[in-house]
Amino acid sequence: ACGGSTLASAAPGAIQAGPDIAIATTPSGKIQGFVHNAILTYRGIPYATAERFMPPQPTRKWADTKMALLYGNICPQSASNPLANFLFSGPHLQQSDDCQNLNIWTPALSDHKPRPVMVWLHGGGFQAGSAIESYAYDGENLSRSGDVVVVSVNHRLNVMGHLDLSAYGQQYQHSANLGVMDLVAALQWIKTNIAQFGGDPNNVTIFGESGGGAKVLTLMATPSAKGLFHKAIVQSGAVEGMGMTLLAPKTTQRVAELTLNNLKLNR
C-alpha cells in the first residue's frame, strides 16, 4: 500500500535525510522520513492492505527500515469526473486501489510532550480526491503553527470503495462500505502508532472540508469508529449532497449489475 509517486515540497528550505534521521519505531517496524524546515515528514505509510473489493487487513511486520519519503498511491480517479480532472491536472500521482496509506507531519518524535493529533479527510465526495491533491494539503505549516501532529489519509473511493457487489457472494458483503472501512482502519492504525510520532492517541481530532466533512459526519455515526477519535470538525460538509447518496440495497445492487454489464464482465 506504499506507492511510488512523488510530489515536490511546496515550501522552500533545506531537507535533511539519512540513515539516522527521522527514524520512528512502530510495532510493525522502523520507518524513515525526512526533516523539512524543522518538521519531521513521513509520506506513504501503509496503514492497511486489502485485496480488491475486500475489507482492509492489518499490515504485516517488516524487517528492514521502511522508507517513507514518497507520497503513496491514490485511489484511481474517473477520467469523466470534472473535479478529478481539475484537481489532478498538476503533479502526477500514481493511481491504484492499493492506496491504504497516510502521511504524517510532526514537530518531534519524543520530547516528553505528546501533541494533539489532527487527521485530515480530503474532499471530492466519496468519488474523487486524495490526501495530497493540493499543495495546501501539505501538513507542514499546520504542524508547525499549531504544534500538532498532522495526518492525511488516502482511502478507496468510487467503485473501488463503494460498489455494492453483495449480490454476487458473501465475500462481497462489505463492498459498498470499503472506503469507510479504510478510514476506520486508518484511525485504528493512528491509535496504535501515533505515540511513536509524538502524538497523543487520546487527543485525536478528525476534520475535513466538503466531501471530507461528509466523511467526518459518517465516522461520527459509525460504531466501529467509536473511541478512535475524540473531536470532530465539519467544514461545509453534509452526508447527502457531498458525493454521497443514501440508497436502498436493491438500488445499489442494480447499480452494480449495470456496471458489470457495461464492462462486459462475467460474474
Language model features with spans:
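Mature extracellular catalytic domain of secreted serine hydrolases
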Residues: 67-90, 170, 174-175, 181-185, ...
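Glycine-rich nucleophile elbow surrounding the catalytic serine of serine-hydrolase chemistry
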Residues: 127, 208-218
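Gly/Ser-rich "nucleophile elbow"/oxyanion-hole loop immediately N-terminal to the catalytic nucleophile
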Residues: 109-114, 165-181, 185-207
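Non-catalytic accessory segments of hydrolases
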Residues: 7-177
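N-terminal Sec signal peptide cleavage junction
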Residues: 2-4
